[in-house]
Amino acid sequence: MQTALYISVLIISSCGLVYELLAGTIASYLLGETVTQFSLIIGTYLFSMGVGSWLSKYLEKDLIPKFLEIELAIGLVGGFSSAILYLSFGQIRYFQIPLFLLVILIGILVGLEIPVLLRILKKELQFKELVSRVLSLDYVGALLASILFPIFFAPKLGLMRTGFIFGILNVGVALWGTWVLPLRQSKIIILRAQSVVVLTLLILGFSYSDLITYYSEESLYTDEIILSKQTQYQRIIVTRWKNEIRLFLNGHLQFSSRDEYRYHETLVHPALLAHPTPKKVLVLGGGDGLAVREILKHKNVESVTLVDLDSAITNLFSEHGILKKLNEESLKNSKVTVINTDAFLWLEESDQIFDVVLIDFPDPSNFSLGKLYTTAFFHTLKRRMNETSVLEIQSTSPLFARSSYWCIERTIASLGFYTLPLHVYVPSFGEWGFVLAGQRPIQFKKDFPKDLKFLNIQELESIQTFPQDMSRVPVEINRLDNQALVRYYDREWNRILD
């Protein structure tokens, strides 16, 4: 019996942590503010475990069948938690209600497990030996789950299937327990019947995960979903309405094919026109290849290095028929080298010097993205530039996130760069901002590529003029130790979205 229960501890601790990770990941995907979501969920989950541990004192008789019933309950609720959350988001206005109800319920049930196990085993071992073994196995199981969740389960199986898999593991513990633990025959029959019912539901859920995911995402997106993919880093959704293609990453719109040219022409061409002879170009982010498409319109460019973290994005936009048509197969051009790694780390290790650097990172909605807009990042980037090099970075909206925009501009300027703020109206986004910078005052050539849809000499002058409601405001410099930009961004966009 001891061995069976020790193995159970290893499994159930893994399951408990995975349910917590699933809730935090889904909440951060759907609501943003990763740090806030994980902090609230972890705190609520741990508090609920404490409540469960306290409630365990009221379980006095038949502890072994009660332990197995707890496992069945956790398997059922935890296994379906991802599906419930995805389906709730599109149907319930206050998504936080089902989110925290599930976290509290799972936390209480998980909190019951270890105290009940300790009481079952108390006659088998000395107390100090019992506690050390059970708790050490509990922590080992949590470690295994924390390693395998981001590396294997989330990217390979997706969040919904991962939930069902661990629910099945919980039920497996209960079913196995009916064979290896001492139970009355009547209890064995009841528990096995319950286990089979719950197991069947979880297997059906696992089998229909794609259908559940499709239905839940259909309720979130008004247009037809033509591609849905979970990667190690993000959820990719591509939608289509007539001839319009839209890309969403973690629920956030990245571009619409109807007007993306306004964004990408403004991101790329001012920088290349600000350099006398741009030959080597570095693109950080921009795995969709749309910025690279614009770069290749400058015939004097000899090489383009694209560094994007997620290989799934660059592969999709290299191979998918509709998507590679959008970027005119730019990622397959012989001038282009694609590198899939962390941009910050790559810059630290590289010794190359570039004429133009274009930065198309996601908005600084969390601290892991916010670090890419800090003085530390731009200082590292500056080592990959010479006195004639220029950089341009997308800088969120100067209208909706005014302090965020000027925080990025001031951070770059604090490192000795001459900066030129730019903005453009993109119908699918609204007013959007960029910062162009170099170690010399910015001066433009006038030899525009011929096939641009939006940018010309007149528009280049126009996008440099900021109206009063987007003009400069006093802001902090964004550093690694203060992450002021993330605070500005959260405050401003939450105000708009509420």
UniProtKB/Swiss-Prot annotation:
<keyword id="KW-0812">Transmembrane</keyword>
<comment type="similarity">
    <text>Belongs to the spermidine/spermine synthase family.</text>
</comment>
<feature type="binding site">
    <location>
        <position position="234"/>
    </location>
    <ligand>
        <name>S-methyl-5'-thioadenosine</name>
    </ligand>
</feature>
<feature type="binding site">
    <location>
        <position position="288"/>
    </location>
    <ligand>
        <name>spermidine</name>
    </ligand>
</feature>
<dbReference type="InterPro" id="IPR030373">
    <property type="entry name" value="PABS_CS"/>
</dbReference>
<dbReference type="InterPro" id="IPR001045">
    <property type="entry name" value="Spermi_synthase"/>
</dbReference>
<keyword id="KW-0620">Polyamine biosynthesis</keyword>
<feature type="transmembrane region" description="Helical">
    <location>
        <begin position="163"/>
        <end position="183"/>
    </location>
</feature>
<keyword id="KW-0745">Spermidine biosynthesis</keyword>
<dbReference type="Pfam" id="PF01564">
    <property type="entry name" value="Spermine_synth"/>
</dbReference>
<dbReference type="GO" id="GO:0005886">
    <property type="term" value="C:plasma membrane"/>
</dbReference>
<comment type="function">
    <text>Catalyzes the irreversible transfer of a propylamine group from the amino donor S-adenosylmethioninamine (decarboxy-AdoMet) to putrescine (1,4-diaminobutane) to yield spermidine.</text>
</comment>
<comment type="subunit">
    <text>Homodimer or homotetramer.</text>
</comment>
<feature type="region of interest" description="Spermidine synthase">
    <location>
        <begin position="196"/>
        <end position="446"/>
    </location>
</feature>
<dbReference type="GO" id="GO:0008295">
    <property type="term" value="P:spermidine biosynthetic process"/>
</dbReference>
<keyword id="KW-1003">Cell membrane</keyword>
<dbReference type="InterPro" id="IPR029063">
    <property type="entry name" value="SAM-dependent_MTases_sf"/>
</dbReference>
<feature type="domain" description="PABS">
    <location>
        <begin position="200"/>
        <end position="439"/>
    </location>
</feature>
<feature type="transmembrane region" description="Helical">
    <location>
        <begin position="35"/>
        <end position="55"/>
    </location>
</feature>
<feature type="transmembrane region" description="Helical">
    <location>
        <begin position="7"/>
        <end position="27"/>
    </location>
</feature>
<feature type="binding site">
    <location>
        <position position="264"/>
    </location>
    <ligand>
        <name>spermidine</name>
    </ligand>
</feature>
<dbReference type="GO" id="GO:0010487">
    <property type="term" value="F:thermospermine synthase activity"/>
</dbReference>
<protein>
    <recommendedName>
        <fullName>Polyamine aminopropyltransferase</fullName>
        <ecNumber>2.5.1.16</ecNumber>
    </recommendedName>
</protein>
<comment type="pathway">
    <text>Amine and polyamine biosynthesis; spermidine biosynthesis; spermidine from putrescine: step 1/1.</text>
</comment>
<keyword id="KW-0808">Transferase</keyword>
<keyword id="KW-0472">Membrane</keyword>
<feature type="binding site">
    <location>
        <position position="308"/>
    </location>
    <ligand>
        <name>S-methyl-5'-thioadenosine</name>
    </ligand>
</feature>
<feature type="transmembrane region" description="Helical">
    <location>
        <begin position="134"/>
        <end position="154"/>
    </location>
</feature>
<keyword id="KW-1133">Transmembrane helix</keyword>
<feature type="transmembrane region" description="Helical">
    <location>
        <begin position="97"/>
        <end position="117"/>
    </location>
</feature>
<feature type="binding site">
    <location>
        <begin position="342"/>
        <end position="343"/>
    </location>
    <ligand>
        <name>S-methyl-5'-thioadenosine</name>
    </ligand>
</feature>
<dbReference type="InterPro" id="IPR030374">
    <property type="entry name" value="PABS"/>
</dbReference>
<feature type="active site" description="Proton acceptor">
    <location>
        <position position="360"/>
    </location>
</feature>
<dbReference type="GO" id="GO:0004766">
    <property type="term" value="F:spermidine synthase activity"/>
</dbReference>
<feature type="transmembrane region" description="Helical">
    <location>
        <begin position="67"/>
        <end position="87"/>
    </location>
</feature>
